[in-house]
């Protein structure tokens, strides 16, 4: 599957640019034939990834950029969100935020860390590389039957 189109954007790591990426993704996904529900899932996952970069990658006095890439294939989209800011320990975040139990009162739920779990739940495949900043690669298939062929859920490279 080497024949694909690629769209790349570079935006300042500021909250007001999250919507620019969402609008671009929405247009691309609609053109590809994704359902309304899948487009909403894609927009939420991308918003979470970019918001994480905006909030955590760069210090307050440091300006940074976020690279966003869309690999457009016949049957799926691959999305890359990358920054060159500070990295994080994925296993530590997982331990601090989960697991959650249905009987736990909402008031006692820990804050933060939901973004990565939400991305994982909404996308068909998620890979995180946090060696030089953070790069999140995620993909979603147009037809849900395709997921079974490539259902390797989440992996990390540290």
Curated annotation (Swiss-Prot):
One Pfam match, given by its short name, reads HATPase_c_2
Its recorded reaction(s) are: L-seryl-[protein] + ATP = O-phospho-L-seryl-[protein] + ADP + H(+); L-threonyl-[protein] + ATP = O-phospho-L-threonyl-[protein] + ADP + H(+)
InterPro entries attached to this UniProt entry? Anti-sigma-factor_SerPK, HATPase_C_sf, RsbW
So which domain of life are we looking at?
Bacteria
- Gene Ontology molecular functions: ATP binding; protein serine kinase activity; protein serine/threonine kinase activity; sigma factor antagonist activity
Transmembrane regions = none
Q: What class of enzyme is it?
A: transferase
Its Enzyme Commission number(s) read 2.7.11.1
Keyword list (alphabetical) reads: ATP-binding, Kinase, Nucleotide-binding, Serine/threonine-protein kinase, Transferase
Matches recorded under HAMAP family: Anti_sigma_B
Q: Which NCBIfam families match?
A: PRK04069.1 (NF003144), rsbW_low_gc (TIGR01924)
Q: What does this protein do?
A: Negative regulator of sigma-B activity. Phosphorylates and inactivates its specific antagonist protein, RsbV. Upon phosphorylation of RsbV, RsbW is released and binds to sigma-B, thereby blocking its ability to form an RNA polymerase holoenzyme (E-sigma-B).
In which family does this protein belong, per the annotation? Belongs to the anti-sigma-factor family.
Protein's name according to its UniProt entry: Serine-protein kinase RsbW
Organism from which the protein derives: Oceanobacillus iheyensis (strain DSM 14371 / CIP 107618 / JCM 11309 / KCTC 3954 / HTE831)
Could you tell me the gene encoding this protein?
A: rsbW
